[in-house]
Design a protein with these regions (language model features):
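Lumenal/extracellular ectodomains and adaptor appendage modules
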Residues: 2-186
Length: 186
C-alpha cells in the first residue's frame, strides 16, 4: 500500500468459520463487512489453491508445493467465479450497480486438503484464512471446529504475506474449537 493513498475499501469486520472434516475437507464460511471509500463495481475474493509450505526435514527447511482443490463456491451476491492455476477468483456485487459505503458479503466453499507428509510422522493442517486483500483489515474473528480432540500446544497462528508476523492473532482452544481475533489492524 502507498502512504496517503485512499484504498478502495476497508474490511471493517471479517468472520471466518471453518469446519474440518475427518477426511481433511474444510467447509469454509466467510462474512465480510466492507466500507467502500469510493464507487466500485464489485468486490473480489481470491481463494488460493496452491501453497508453498516450509517443512523442516533432516536437511533443514525445504519448501514443498501443495495443491488443495476449492469447490462448491457459493455467495449471496455472486457475480462470477474464474479459475486458474493459483486458485479461484470470486467476484461479488450486484449486476449494473456501483458499490459504496458499508456493504456485506458472504461466501462459502469447500477445500480438499491432504496429508502434508511431515518427516516426524506428525500431521499438519495448513490453510490461509485471508489472501490477497490489498487493504486494511480492522477486525477479524475466526472459529475452527476440528473433528476430534488435539494437542492445543501444537496450534500456532500468525499473519503476514508469508506467515512471518507473530502475535497478531489471539488464539484459544475450547474442546475441539480453535478461535481468536485479530489483535491489531492489518
Amino acid at each position: 500500500r502507498t502512504a496517503n493513498a485512499v484504498e478502495a475499501y476497508t474490511v471493517e469486520n471479517l468472520d471466518i468459520t471453518i469446519q474440518v472434516q475427518e477426511d481433511g475437507k474444510l467447509l469454509v464460511f466467510e462474512e465480510y463487512d466492507l466500507n467502500f471509500n469510493y464507487y466500485r463495481s464489485s468486490f473480489t475474493r481470491n481463494i488460493t489453491s496452491t501453497y508453498h509450505i516450509p517443512v523442516t526435514t533432516t536437511q533443514g527447511v525445504v519448501y514443498r508445493d501443495y495443491y488443495f482443490p476449492v469447490r462448491d463456491i457459493q455467495g449471496d451476491r455472486l457475480l462470477s467465479v474464474e479459475r486458474n492455476e493459483d486458485g479461484s477468483i470470486v467476484t461479488m456485487g450486484e449486476e449494473g450497480m456501483q458499490l459504496t459505503g458499508r456493504q456485506k458479503f458472504s461466501i462459502s466453499y469447500t477445500v480438499q486438503t491432504s496429508d502434508l507428509q511431515m518427516p516426524d510422522q506428525s500431521q499438519m493442517l495448513y490453510w490461509t484464512l485471508v489472501t490477497n486483500l490489498d487493504t486494511r483489515v480492522n477486525h477479524l474473528h475466526y472459529e475452527i471446529e476440528m473433528p476430534k480432540a488435539f494437542d492445543p500446544q501444537e496450534v500456532y497462528t500468525n499473519t503476514g504475506k508469508y506467515g512471518d508476523v507473530k502475535n497478531t492473532l489471539s488464539m484459544q482452544v475450547n474442546g475441539n474449537i480453535i478461535s481468536g481475533d485479530l489483535l491489531q489492524p492489518l
